[in-house]
């Protein structure tokens, strides 16, 4: 009996360990006190049925455990149980992550949803914009992240310090920033003040900035130096490449050995184009479908393509040709010189527009969307997207209301399958809805409200040139699920049906 009791107690202990969590679950009556008593908190607002939330859960747990020793708390709120609390904090989709420094200092989490990224982001949040660096803590500071920046500035050089602080405030989510006025330490690090050293745990190990301290120049130096010469393109790095502001060259290959071989072969090209084009390898077995997004065949590798991120233009290298140093160098040089036309993927132009919603394809995009005489509301959708399917009848109703209104010749309700057509807009998820006002086509307005006919009409009336307010008969309701956006990497619908990994970024 004694042994049985010990065995039972052992099972209970094991269960306690297995179920222990470093993520604190908060409710309405505990939320405010928890935020007030902890200097820095990352809170996740989630729903148990949400596929993206389920995918985040183990990553969030791992990050919470890692950050516990640094006294950075991770919390979560179940919005199906705490509806009022979630509405109070403006939650419109799941998961929503917010950084709290007290109840009055709240900012959205802008990092990736991976344990390492969450950990890195929150550590940077815990640091001051610029940390003091000395000979005693320099080596430790270098290890704070994959890339850190240290300014070596004389104590009397207030101007350089102010410029560096401006950059740090702007980019603090991306890199840890440190500063030292120790001339001997600067000399030991091989620089003379004023200078900035970017320390990194890849490529050549560090990069030095010794030009005049100007915000734009330092920003460019940081972004260029912190990007691997030839990095790895995947879910954790993709958004960073997309936000870098320069073209991205993809090297597709099916094996790690082949990716390394091609990287070594093309490295001199990447070095010559540093700061002009980012280069990265991509696993063709895991993410081969992304080749199709670049207008490459998805069954013929290795392959190479360049994406002009700002204009969302694709420049695929001929897959019938061998990837050699000479061939890729010539291709890249021609791209930089503007000698290559972008490849455009488009469905056929509809022979006739049927229905109240105008169908847009790549070949008629400019003609319809950029018609300067009309306010054009356009939905960028994906056929597999569950939220797009849910929106469809409401969007048709919206189109019908405008088609029979006094604004029928001045307002267009349109849609485009963004998976089958190249569009110049940067689309982060589906559905994305934008209004291109007449007379201001260069300043489209992205819709972020609930997906009801009433609210969409209000959006058009408030942001369009013609202030096209119309009435609608049916009263619509909205919920957080209606405003959720599905990322292009994974549809929530598919996440519910299968646990297999998707091969899109």
UniProtKB/Swiss-Prot annotation:
Enumerate the residues marked as the site Lowers pKa of C-terminal Cys of second active site.
Answer: 451
Q: Which residue positions hold the site described Contributes to redox potential value?
A: 51-52, 386-387
Taxonomic superkingdom: Eukaryota
Grouped into one coarse class, the protein's main location is endoplasmic reticulum
Which Gene3D superfamilies does the record match to this protein? Glutaredoxin
- The disulfide bridges present are 50-53, 385-388
> Where is the segment annotated Disordered?
470-505
Enzyme Commission designation: 5.3.4.1
Enzyme type, top EC level: isomerase
Q: Cite the record's Basic and acidic residues compositional bias ranges.
A: 489-505
The residue numbers the entry assigns to motif Prevents secretion from ER are 502-505
Task: Identify the catalytic residues.
Answer: 50 (nucleophile), 53 (nucleophile), 385 (nucleophile), 388 (nucleophile)
> What catalytic reaction does the record list?
Catalyzes the rearrangement of -S-S- bonds in proteins
Keywords on record: Disulfide bond, Endoplasmic reticulum, Isomerase, Redox-active center, Repeat, Signal
| Positions of the Thioredoxin domain | 21-128, 335-465
Annotated signal sequence is: 1-20
Residue ranges with Low complexity bias = 477-488
Task: List, alphabetically, the PANTHER family matched.
Answer: PROTEIN DISULFIDE ISOMERASE, PROTEIN DISULFIDE-ISOMERASE A3
Q: Which NCBIfam families match?
A: ER_PDI_fam, pdi_dom
Q: What does the record give as the function of this protein?
A: Participates in the folding of proteins containing disulfide bonds, may be involved in glycosylation, prolyl hydroxylation and triglyceride transfer.
Name this protein carries in UniProt? Protein disulfide-isomerase
The species this protein belongs to is Humicola insolens (Soft-rot fungus)
């Amino acid at each position: 009996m004694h042994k049985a009791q010990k065995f039972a107690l052992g099972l209970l202990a094991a269960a306690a360990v297995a179920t222990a969590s470093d993520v604190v679950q908060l409710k309405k009556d505990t939320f405010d006190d928890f935020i007030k008593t902890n200097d820095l908190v990352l809170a996740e607002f989630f729903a148990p049925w949400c596929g993206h939330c389920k995918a985040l859960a183990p990553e969030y747990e791992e990050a919470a455990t890692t950050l516990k020793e640094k006294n950075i708390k991770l919390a979560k709120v179940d919005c199906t149980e705490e509806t009022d609390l979630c509405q109070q904090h403006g939650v419109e989709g799941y998961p929503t992550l917010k950084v709290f420094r007290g109840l009055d200092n709240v900012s959205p989490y802008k990092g990736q949803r991976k344990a390492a990224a969450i950990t890195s982001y929150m550590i940077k949040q815990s640091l001051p914009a610029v940390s003091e660096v000395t000979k005693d803590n320099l080596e430790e500071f270098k290890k704070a992240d994959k890339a850190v920046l240290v300014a070596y500035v004389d104590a009397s050089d207030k101007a350089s310090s102010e410029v560096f602080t401006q950059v740090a405030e702007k980019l603090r989510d991306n890199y840890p920033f440190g500063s030292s006025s120790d001339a001997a330490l600067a000399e030991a690090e091989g620089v003379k003040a004023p200078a900035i050293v970017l320390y990194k745990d890849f490529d050549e190990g560090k990069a030095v900035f010794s030009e005049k301290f100007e915000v734009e120049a330092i920003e460019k130096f940081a972004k260029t130096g912190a990007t691997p010469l030839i990095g790895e393109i995947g879910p954790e790095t993709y958004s960073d490449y997309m936000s870098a502001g320069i073209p991205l060259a993809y090297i597709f290959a099916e094996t790690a050995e082949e990716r390394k071989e091609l990287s070594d072969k093309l490295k001199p090209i990447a070095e010559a184009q540093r700061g002009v084009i980012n280069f990265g390898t991509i696993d063709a077995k895991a993410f081969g479908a992304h080749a199709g997004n670049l207008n490459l065949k998805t069954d013929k590798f290795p392959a190479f393509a360049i994406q002009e991120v700002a204009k969302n233009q694709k420049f695929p290298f001929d897959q019938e040709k061998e990837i050699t140093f000479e061939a890729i160098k010539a291709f890249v040089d021609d791209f930089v010189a503007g000698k290559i036309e972008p490849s455009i993927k488009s469905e056929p132009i509809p022979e006739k527009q049927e229905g109240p919603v105008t169908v847009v394809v790549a070949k008629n995009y400019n003609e319809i969307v950029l018609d300067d005489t009309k306010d054009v509301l356009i939905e960028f959708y994906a056929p597999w997207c569950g939220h797009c399917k849910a929106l469809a009848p409401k969007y048709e109703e919206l189109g019908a209301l405008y088609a029979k209104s006094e604004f029928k010749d001045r307002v267009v309700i349109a849609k485009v399958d963004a998976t089958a057509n190249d569009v110049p807009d940067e689309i982060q998820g589906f559905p994305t809805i934008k209004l291109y006002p007449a007379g201001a086509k260069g300043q489209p307005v992205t819709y972020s409200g609930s997906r009801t006919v009433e609210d969409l009409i209000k959006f058009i009336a408030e942001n369009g040139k013609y202030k096209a307010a119309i009435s609608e008969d049916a009263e619509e309701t909205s919920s957080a699920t209606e405003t959720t956006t599905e990322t292009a990497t994974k549809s929530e619908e598919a996440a519910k049906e299968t646990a297999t990994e998707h091969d899109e970024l």
